[in-house]
Amino acid sequence: MLLFAVVWGSGACLSVNAATKRPFVLVIDAGHGGKDAGAVGQLTKEKDINLNVALALGRLVEQNCPNVKVIYTRKTDVFVTLQGRADIANRNKADLFISVHTNSSPVGKAAPMGAETYTLGMHRAADNLEVAKRENSVITQESNYKQ
């Protein structure tokens, strides 16, 4: 979040996709939602934190970068399938897709601090596949996940 605040606070906004001459499209995905709570703490659920962060990020972009088109995969506590999230990004020809997730830690452990950013590269395709399988195991909650 700080990186976005610094970049947009300095007035450095992308406004047009140079290759297509159309507005830059940012899709913000609030991870989990609806029947998929994500990590559950004593007082919070990941889906709620993700939604609040995604909406705050979107507002920050909208207020500081009026030429950036912001699209959300969800603005309320609803379940959106993984395919549905991809469809939203693809249908809108997203230039950037940001999926917001938060971590949890076991009770009694020191509270983690900081941020993590994950990107997939082709240099470790086998490892990436295992991560993708683990992260996408939520797909079994979808009614038609065997398709």
Summary of predicted features, one role per range:
Residues 16-146:
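Catalytic-core regions of hydrolytic enzymes
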Residues 1-11:
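Bacterial N-terminal signal peptides
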